[in-house]
Amino acid sequence: MTQVAKKILVTCALPYANGSIHLGHMLEHIQADVWVRYQRMRGHEVNFICADDAHGTPIMLKAQQLGITPEQMIGEMSQEHQTDFAGFNISYDNYHSTHSDENRELSELIYTRLKENGFIKNRTISQLYDPEKGMFLPDRFVKGTCPKCKSADQYGDNCEVCGATYSPTELIEPKSVVSGATPVMRDSEHFFFDLPSFSEMLQAWTRSGALQEQVANKMQEWFESGLQQWDISRDAPYFGFEIPNAPGKYFYVWLDAPIGYMGSFKNLCDKRGDTTSFDEYWKKDSDAELYHFIGKDIVYFHSLFWPAMLEGSHFRKPTNLFVHGYVTVNGAKMSKSRGTFIKASTWLKHFDADSLRYYYTAKLSSRIDDIDLNLEDFVQRVNADIVNKVVNLASRNAGFINKRFDGVLAAELADPQLYKTFTDAAAVIGEAWESREFGKAIREIMALADIANRYVDEQAPWVVAKQEGRDADLQAICSMGINLFRVLMTYLKPVLPTLSERVEAFLNSELNWDAIEQPLLGHKVNTFKALYNRIDMKQVEALVEASKEEVKAAAAPVTGPLADFPIQETITFDDFAKIDLRVALIENAEFVDGSDKLLRLTLDLGGEKRNVFSGIRSAYPDPQALIGRQTVMVANLAPRKMRFGVSEGMVMAAGPGGKDIFLLSPDDGAKPGQQVK
């Protein structure tokens, strides 16, 4: 029976927009999607959203290395991420970006409310500064040894080993990621969120019983060690949102990242023309349910900072956090050298999405345990469960129904009590899906599959088919088998969306949770076609080799204008002002005898002639083509005596050299002698 419909908003942690989705990411998105699909099957109103986490130092730095803008990079990465999630049938209602108008407005609103309510504090801090690059070093520009667990090579904001958060100044033996230099201390005014003011509220939330026991225990440790004010600002240069009325100061990425959940939902509401749901879901007294699926490495931000920010800005808090562990492959951390660091897109070139969805689901529980993807066990389990137990149940019976009875099922069940055993299991299996005890749900379903196959073995329709006068028995047995198959696939529909579509096409009926109470009787099914193919270790071997090759390709040096020719050391405006750039008309251009690189240019600066030797011959093999063209030259460069004569300046050109040299030209209207500023 359909439950009372609930309004539910579900999110996954926002993937960072500087890298590809891999199988570690997919655990969370598959877990959330299975849960969401189950909720939808039970008639609930579910909004399932996500976005790219698109701000911060790593994105700015990588874009610089690639020679593109951060906006261009995050745009390309968003398309890649969405393609990967669609390939795994992750049923998002909206996928957005934290670099959006909605997120900017909401970040500024929350910050303003926190400030007005007295939860933002200003103070001057000593901050690490790169003396070689002349810039303050945000968290991700600094690496060193964690001050808590002493793990080496950790970033300046949190430790990926023990999960601790800290300030960059607490790192042991810090180094600048940009230059490798040892940073020095400089003062800078920063903005802090007064997290300790919310300690009582957070402790009450922890004791409410909603959080996983492991999460609540970890939070208690943090309370006992004392909550600290949280630095929410970063100095320029930084890719993100500038803090209102604070030029050169930006919101730290972890302030606007969780607000991205709200921004993505706001964007979805706007797309729908829905003017009420955003407030209905996010208001302080909302009766909608809000769930965040996250990894155990970001519990600190989601269990402390995020609910405190929401409370302090008069929004509702999450109903619960659903936290999962990490993914290992073949019992070890994912390894690029071993080919077990596998991208989502690479997986889909060798296996279907349903296979990984099933394997992860079979291993997941409501606890925060790590999941091991054992590739040999993966092949065995998919073949044993999906192919041998479930799909085989249909194939063993469908042929007889199609050939002997024109696809029409029997008018009555052969064993109503057995069918009731299967439908009665809906309560236990449904509760397992609801409580995220996915492994238990799969075990219950496979136990039923064993019973169904045992029924077919005992009834032996292949024997009955050869016996005269037993057509009715044959139809009843095979119809019973197909009806049991239908119940099993209804229970598995949240896990196996692609297979479920094929099954629905064969059954000529939708797999609906509430409909299983009524078996398909006297119903016509379609011609049976192969539903799922066996997999083998050769596919695994090809997958691993492909992953190794991708790692080799990724390890190749980054190329591009900025990567090949890094920006030079910073100069002052006074230094730049010493350079006198002028528009020059090329009156004559000719080869230089004795040189295969130089052209001799005669330049008119509007009343003054200059003779310039320029190494652009390989790019301009016909000097005459340059005559009459305007360019830009350094007019106050000291004359340089060469064996061909004296060069009285330098023309400006772009490019790496050789044939790739591009002489600069001013727009039409510029006149010889005009200064370039």
From Swiss-Prot:
Full protein name: Methionine--tRNA ligase
Residue sites binding Zn(2+) per the record: 146, 149, 159, 162
One BP term from GO: methionyl-tRNA aminoacylation
NCBIfam families per record: metG, metG_C_term, PRK00133.1
Localization (cell): Cytoplasm
Family annotation (InterPro entries): aa-tRNA-synth_I_CS, Anticodon_Met, Met-tRNA-synth_bsu_C, Met-tRNA_ligase_1, Met-tRNA_synth, Methionyl/Leucyl_tRNA_Synth, MetRS_core, MetRS_Zn
Stated family: Belongs to the class-I aminoacyl-tRNA synthetase family. MetG type 1 subfamily.
EC identifiers of the protein: 6.1.1.10
Domain of life where this protein originates: Bacteria
Binding, ATP: 336
PANTHER family found in the cross-reference section: METHIONINE--TRNA LIGASE (PTHR45765), METHIONINE--TRNA LIGASE, CYTOPLASMIC (PTHR45765:SF1)
Domain tRNA-binding intervals: 575-677
Entry's Gene Ontology cellular component terms: cytosol
Motif 'KMSKS' region boundaries: 333-337
CDD domains assigned to the protein according to its UniProt record, in alphabetical order: Anticodon_Ia_Met (cd07957), MetRS_core (cd00814), tRNA_bind_EcMetRS_like (cd02800)
